[in-house]
Amino acid sequence: MSFHRYRPRLPGGELAPMPWPVSLYRVLNHVAWPLEAESGRWTVFLDRLMIFLGFLVFCEHNEVDFHYLIANRQDMDNMLTGLPTYLILVEMQIRCFQLAWHKDRFRALLQRFYAEIYVSEEMEPHLFASIQRQMLATRVNSTVYLLALLNFFLVPVTNVIYHRREMLYKQVYPFDNTQLHFFIPLLVLNFWVGFIITSMLFGELNVMGELMMHLNARYIQLGQDLRRSAQMLLKKSSSLNVAIAYRLNLTHILRRNAALRDFGQRVEKEFTLRIFVMFAFSAGLLCALFFKAFTNPWGNVAYIVWFLAKFMELLALGMLGSILLKTTDELGMMYYTADWEQVIHQSDNVGENVKLMKLVTLAIQLNSRPFFITGLNYFRVSLTAVLKIIQGAFSYFTFLNSMR
């Protein structure tokens, strides 16, 4: 099945380079990653069948995780041991299978990204290097999430050493799951759920980051081209033609700007619900993780690593959102400082000067509002929103600690 999963290509037809977290996301997560557009009917049917079975597995895990919380509702410490895995399970079930429902739309977005937006290292080495620096936090976060998963996968090792039969996560089954014919398949399902959840966590973050930072680079490129066009025309064009040439260049730049904004809106449409769900669960998840890490650090190393991973994920996404917001906000000011007044001063064509001033006014109006990604229009993805979530999480922690 992995051979039929979509592999992005550049406009020339060659395979597009993908960062290692996205490549790993593609390999590990058959639920979220789309198939190739030309996949056969049986391949599509088998993929949908696997998604349906995966959904049932998530429902089963949801049930037994919740039973653990109910069984330990009188013991806050034990209940909070199982709460983080339950919260992340519910969050990922919503995000992952919502994406699975819209796989074709996601593939179309990736196709457009690599066809129109992607900044290659060969064409723009400086911009590409800047993107890699901006994405460094998401790469580190991917490594930390894998370390968090590894901590859970140490459970089978301790099972062998201490002759126990414990699941990877805190779960209560309505039957004796320690019987070998139940235990082994259930443990395998635990592993599968762990891979799907972890790959979704770092994979989607890196996909969003790539889309946002390459879009950001295109906006930077747009501003550079606008400034260069005025400088070149002032040096080369005659006083009669300079306004005409600049107006044509400005029209072309405005069309490029509209195309970039349209792509940004497509990104917003694709991710807005999943971002909302991510942020909605984050405060409670951070609170529970920090509580476990704070109350027993040496006994909850997995929770400490997981807390760091979640904390870094939110900060990385907020930082990328703030970068895009800042760039598009500055783009509105760019039209004020694009030397159009020098073009009008040099031009002797009064009619074209009037048309140019009207076009500049339109450009300023169109770019008066910066572009930003939101969570169902409730909040902007930015460091400000992330800091509010972190503040809320620590407020909940203070309350829980006082209850203890």
Swiss-Prot record:
Membrane-topology annotation of the record: Multi-pass membrane protein
One Pfam family linked to the record: 7tm_6
Intervals, Extracellular compartment: 60-67, 163-181, 296-303, 402-404
Keyword Membrane: yes
Parts of the chain on the Cytoplasmic side: 1-38, 89-141, 203-274, 325-380
Localization annotation: Cell membrane
Superkingdom classification of source: Eukaryota
GO cellular component: cation channel complex; dendrite membrane; plasma membrane
GO MF term (any one): olfactory receptor activity
Example GO biological process: detection of chemical stimulus involved in sensory perception of smell
Ranges annotated as spanning the membrane: 39-59, 68-88, 142-162, 182-202, 275-295, 304-324, 381-401
Keywords: Cell membrane, Membrane, Olfaction, Receptor, Sensory transduction, Transducer, Transmembrane, Transmembrane helix
Principal location class: membrane
Function, as annotated: Odorant receptor which mediates acceptance or avoidance behavior, depending on its substrates. The odorant receptor repertoire encodes a large collection of odor stimuli that vary widely in identity, intensity, and duration. May form a complex with Orco to form odorant-sensing units, providing sensitive and prolonged odorant signaling and calcium permeability. Involved in the behavioral responses to octanol, anisole, and 2-heptanone.
Note: The atypical heteromeric and topological design of the odorant receptors appears to be an insect-specific solution for odor recognition, making the OR/Orco complex an attractive target for the development of highly selective insect repellents to disrupt olfactory-mediated host-seeking behaviors of insect disease vectors. Odor-evoked OR currents are independent of known G-protein-coupled second messenger pathways.
Self-association and partners: Interacts with Orco. Complexes exist early in the endomembrane system in olfactory sensory neurons (OSNs), coupling these complexes to the conserved ciliary trafficking pathway.
Similarity-based family: Belongs to the insect chemoreceptor superfamily. Heteromeric odorant receptor channel (TC 1.A.69) family. Or1a subfamily.
Protein name: Odorant receptor 74a
Annotated source species: Drosophila melanogaster (Fruit fly)
